[in-house]
Amino acid sequence: KEILEKYHDLFTLQWQGVAGNEHVPSQAEWEQLLTNCSGFLFYGMERFMSHLVLNRMVAMNIPKCHLMILLDLVRSKESYQRIMNSDIQKSYLHIAIERPTETAMLLSLTGVGSVIANQWYTTLQENAERLEILSKNLMTTGRTTGRAVRILQK
């Protein structure tokens, strides 16, 4: 929340979404947020795609979304238990589509212009640092997404 508030005025007055522990978004809320955004930020636990209904996601059209930042792949005891319970009901192929590369490809096919995503599991603190670096470089200094990611890699 601190990072969003810090860069709120520099980017847009129309930030929309769910922050903190407000509630768990419904599938309809996810779809509404995704289809009406020009940029999308996910900062959360486990795999981003595990929070969505895959069959509905593959049918979506998201051409307005120019940039999607997925700071996911964070694991806690509770999130691991939730994901394990959820994965029991899924096929191997369904779980495979939720991996980072496959998620980026799927989002690209739905119309998302650029995807910045983690490739490996990480911590909330490391994702907070990534978000700070990306926000500073994209919103304050106006760097391109490619340059901001390159700075992030260093």
Task: Show the residue positions of the predicted features.
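Short, conserved loop/helix-junction motifs that constitute active-site signature segments
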Residues: M57-K64, T110
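Short, glycine/acidic-rich beta->alpha junctions
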Residues: E22-P25, M49, I95-P100
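Alpha-helical scaffolding within the catalytic cores
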Residues: S26, H51-A59, T101-A104
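Active-site-proximal C-terminal subdomain of hydrolase catalytic domains
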Residues: L67, R75-K154
